[in-house]
Amino acid sequence: MATRIKLSLFIGLFCFLSLASAQKSSTDQAQIRGAMEFLASDAMQGRASGSHDELLAATYLASQLREIGIAPAGDAGGYIQDVSGEFNFYREGKKQWNTRNVVGRLEGRDEKLKDQVILLTAHMDHIGIGKPVNGDNIYNGADDDASGCVAVLQLARALAHEKAPKRTVIFVFFGSEETGGQGDQYFLQHPPVPLKSIVVNLEFEMIGRADSAVKPDELWLTGFDRSNLGPKLAKHGAHLVADPHPKQSFFQRSDNYALAKQGIVAHTVSSFGLHTDYHQPSDDVAHIDFDHMEQAIHSMLGPVRWLANSDFKPVWVEGKKP
């Protein structure tokens, strides 16, 4: 009975979101809200790493890429990359694990540049069911990181509805980031393109609220001073500044870091202001600032579009490569 009820909720939410996604604007707030209400709903039970609920999130995200017109780049001609094997965990060391990534591809049109890849990513998992706080035990993960997933979806939608970019753009929703990045570990071991072809990775993490440490319309880039990417994106319209919370070591705390350790210029875009709902049941849709989120996604569209159509290759600052 519980399974049937959950399936009914899933179908109902999916139908609602499909109606919302019929809007034309690439950063339409109804689309953003609909996707957030789906991914961070109580029915998804917090999308715990490696769980059935994470699989539901993956299935939903894959269906959205298909609807948008992004080609599959996962296993066996599909969008899902099944992740299975022995992985490193934050607390338990190495152990067997099963999760999944969602991978889509927008082929570049330029014969000289299409083999260069722009990688846009977010993580779809959160921490699931946990200790009750004020009677609520569902850790919805609206800001962390449903907001990043929706940003990547909206950027994919915009790019897919334009003339194909010169470079190839790959979109990835990683699984099991919260438990140590098992999804990004597997991606690096089984990449859909040669790793050397990935020019840059931008991870989107926690953009659902403004950070009072910077201006209201600004986002920040982890590891800003480690490469020339941030200043270049800012020059092309991104409202990006350096991470105002260096003591938090955010550069090392998201999927981008695993790629950076492989030499890929990889950073995370965020506006996390250290709010107290982090990893709490209160990180829910009710606390998302949708005006900010819409503006944040829109502010990155032009710079990402430029990056996908330029021949610019970011480089690490001497001595700052991980």
Regions found by a protein language model. Name each.
Residues S8-S18:
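Bacterial N-terminal signal peptides
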Residues A20-P72, K114-D115, V317:
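N-terminal hydrophobic or amphipathic helices/low-complexity stretches enriched
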Residues Q23-S25, D42-H52, N88-G93, V133-D145, ...:
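Second-shell loop/turn segments in exported
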Residues L39, L65, N88, E92-P132:
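Acidic/His- and Gly-rich active-site-bordering loop/insert found
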Residues R47-E107:
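A non-catalytic alpha/beta surface segment that caps or lines the substrate-entry region
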Residues G104, K114-H126, G130-G180, M300:
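Alpha-helical metal-binding/catalytic segments enriched in His/Glu/Asp
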Residues H161, T276-P322:
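His/Asp/Glu-rich mid-to-C-terminal helical/loop segments that flank catalytic regions of hydrolases
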Residues A164, F174-T268, F272-D277, V315:
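Metal-dependent peptidase/peptidase-like ectodomains
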